[in-house]
Structure formats: structure tokens, C-alpha cells
Amino acid sequence: MSASIVAPPPERSVAIAQARRELIHGEASRSRGSARVEPWILRSWERCMEAGCQPQQRITFEPVAKSAVRDVAERNRALVSAARPVIERLSRAIVDTRYFAVLTDADGIVVDVGPLPDGTDTASRYARNIARVGVDLSERAVGTSAISTALAEQESVWLHRGEHFFEDTSVYSCAGAPLFGPQGNCIGMLDLTGVQALERPELRHLATLSARSIENVLVMNEPCELRLHLSWPGCPGGEATEGLLCIDAGGTVSGANAAARQMLHQPLARSHAPQCNDLFALPLAMLFDAARRGDAVLEVPLWSGLRVQVRPQRGGKGSPGALPEARPRLRDVEAALIRKAVTDARGNVAEAARTLGISRATVYRKLWRGRASTDTPG
């Protein structure tokens, strides 16, 4: 494909130019041009101006010392290892578009790159300028970009040509998606960049999907005693939709992917790591036992009244020690049956009590005891 400069559609180009004149150059508003530019772009422009930057400033990409490259590689070994197979796959999807993949850490420092477009033309030179491990592509270094805005907003973005703050970076078009680690913290972002290329906003979807794949690999690599694969009943699970939870020997959630956080409506972060008991109305010992059987898929009630399908597995890579012995205690089984009856009765305790042939007071007492205690295997 030719690397000739391709402008965005006329309407969008005019809106971008008008927004730049109004916000960056202080021109009085004569239209609603700025309303056609995404709010997160305007916020980034404002941050650049507050930092004393001017659009016409020259942006240079200095050589990176070998020692700095080694330090970056060492610090991000786990991220790069998880991302590289994903980058190889997505690079096949964009091979004919003159776009390429860039992986950064949470500070916008390049930690890995995909294959670059062939050539010795100006576009290839621009690509090589940024596609080097150790290059700083943060907002403080290069202004508004998909990298800086994805990290600042922690949302996937698409950015084309004149939406970059600096004139020197207006040759780039890029899609970006943030990356979140198993504990829920932002650990970097995945960027798909083209130079003087056709506008491809659909790459935002590819970047987002690929970022979720990288996150899933990181969760699968997280040391744990038990790993839970979650899906909704009747909905086939897949890499893009399956929830993943890492559980330690004490029943604490030690890692999760984005799908699990959404399905369980929980942050599942290091600062808010719930017990398995807080999520599932089922004894943890039963999940460990199902993992030992190896092929069990359970339909598990949540405290919200919803149900999820859970496929428990023994802890994977890096898990210390063997899976502890786990046998459900009688009181745990009893409590689980009561929870199930309440869930089946859609929260109607009186109806659940009638079904079980026990008093409502007994139902309340058993539920409270099960909720307050922490179930551990063994």
C-alpha cells in the first residue's frame, strides 16, 4: 500500500481544524467545531497547554542507551512475554495497512513493538522513530496521542492526524487500549499506529480485543491455588467473554480479568480483594473438590440472586505447592442447600423455608452464619 498522505473526510478535517483554532490558538468560536472532537482529546490538549507546550514545538526522538533498553526489558519481562504471541497474531490482521503494534508500560515507555512496514520512505522513518524499546511516548514527551489518552482516560481510543497536539506528530494515526493487570491496576497499553495512512477507526476494536487477550494471559500466569472460569448459563464461554478468577488457599481473590469484574460487579483489586464467600453462595471447599475432579462445570448462585457457570481448575503456572485436600463439611453442604433454596425462591425466605421444611428463623440463622464465616479448604 502506498504511504502517501491521506486526509480524513472533509467534514471531520474541518471540525478538527476549527477545534484547534478555538482551544489551542484562542480563536473565538464561530461554530460547533469543538463539539465534533472527543472530550478526552480536548482534555489532553488542555493538559499540554497547561504544561506550557506549543503545537509548533519540534518533537525529537533521541537514541536510547543500551543500558536503558536492558532496564526496560527486565522490568517488563512478564508483560512482554504475555503480549508477544498476541502481537504476532494481530500483526497478521494489519499487515497490509501500514499499521504496526507498539506496547508500552504504564508510563508510556515503549517495551515491545510488532513488525514494522517495509520501506525506506519518510513514513518508514517516522515509524522507526517511535518503534524502539525505551522511547518515551508519554504525554509529557509527545503530547496528545492514543498512548497518552488511553493511559490518562483508561479507555480505548482512536486518534487521527490533526487530533495530536503537536504538528510534528500529526503524521500519525493510532488506536490504543489500556492494559490492566490481574490486581486491576493499569500496567500499560497496546497501540496500533499508522504513518500517513488511511484512517482506520475500526482498529480501536482490534486493539481492545487484543488488550483483553493479553490481560487473560497475565491472569492465567498468576500464581494461585484455584482458577475459576466464569460464564453465564446458556452462553458459550470464549476468550473474549470468559471471566477468570484466581483464588489463593485461604479463599481470597488474588487476581481477575476485566470480564470477571464486570460479571461480578466488583473491582476485585488489590485494595479490595474479597473472599470467595463474599461472591458465591457456595462453600469454597466444593469448588476445590470440583477442580480435583477436573471436568466439573457448576451452576453457582451469587448473593445477588444471579447464577453463573463456573469451571474450577487447579492453580496453574507458578502455583506453589499441591492443591490442598478439600472435603465439604456437613454444615457447609447444609448452608449451600439453604442458599440454593432461597435463590430458587427469588429471595423469598418464607417460601424457601416451606420448601425445606424448616422455620424462617433457621434459614436466617444459617444464612448469617455462612455469610459471616470464611470457608477454607480442608
Residue spans for each PLM region:
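Intrinsically disordered, low-complexity terminal regulatory regions
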Residues: 1-141, 145-161, 171, 180-250, ...
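N-terminal capping loop/helix in small sensory signaling domains highlighted by a polar->aromatic N-x2-3-F motif
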Residues: 114, 255-267
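PAS/PAS-like sensory domain cap-loop motif
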Residues: 121-123, 264-272
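PAS-family sensory/regulatory domains
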Residues: 133-135, 270-282
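PAS-family sensory/regulatory modules and their coupling/dimerization elements
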Residues: 162-163, 171-176, 278-325
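Extended hydrophobic-aromatic, low-complexity segments
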Residues: 256, 272, 351-354
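Bacterial C-terminal helix-turn-helix
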Residues: 328-378
